[in-house]
């Protein structure tokens, strides 16, 4: 992703999944929440400071896998982010508390469909298209590694359609649809 043409380290941010330190290790256990895209993010120091050399990728990978940042530090207690002001994170909080009595933020995993975006914005169609294939493969790998019981996408069909088709081998099963007021949710068994 960091080698996509037109990417400027001072103008783009890269997302890596967040996994709580108490995320279940058993197969088919835990919850993986998926958002649309980065929309601004704090990056490991090597993203902005490393020289543009072959070693950049390894420095970034080392920062990601040696990070001790959890959802609690990254989202809930971030000095420049209002967790309580985010309907997105309040919904994740409420759903997680249905499964876990306390400390939900240490027991879930979070990722995005698209991993690369301009700071403070979601990727435009061009940037989405440049990264779509690799992001679909990354999402499948995240699901494989984390082996969650539930994968909950807060994305809408427009954003998730190609990803769902990819994860389902090119043919979507009929979803279970639930409506409440003007809202609806769709559940797929994949």
Label the predicted regions.
Residues 1-146, 150, 156-160:
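A polyanion-binding, active-site-adjacent surface
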Residues 82-99, 163-190:
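Charged, glycine-enriched surface loops/patches
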């Amino acid at each position: 992703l960091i080698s996509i043409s037109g990417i400027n380290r001072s103008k783009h941010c890269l997302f890596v999944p967040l996994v709580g330190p108490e995320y279940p290790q058993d197969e088919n256990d835990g919850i993986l929440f998926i958002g649309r895209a980065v929309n601004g993010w704090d990056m490991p120091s090597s993203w902005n400071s490393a020289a543009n050399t072959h070693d950049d990728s390894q420095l970034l990978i080392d920062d990601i896998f040696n990070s001790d940042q959890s959802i609690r530090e990254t989202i809930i207690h971030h000095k420049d982010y209002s967790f309580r002001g985010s309907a997105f994170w309040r919904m994740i909080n409420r759903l997680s508390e249905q499964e876990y009595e306390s400390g939900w933020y240490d027991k879930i995993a979070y990722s995005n469909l698209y991993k690369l975006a301009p700071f403070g914005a979601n990727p435009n169609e061009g940037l989405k298209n440049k990264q779509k294939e690799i992001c679909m493969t990354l999402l499948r790998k995240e699901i494989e590694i984390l082996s969650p019981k539930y994968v909950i996408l807060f994305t809408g069909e427009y954003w998730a359609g190609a990803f769902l088709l990819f994860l389902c081998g090119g043919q979507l099963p009929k979803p279970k649809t639930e409506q409440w007021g003007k809202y609806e949710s769709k559940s797929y068994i994949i």
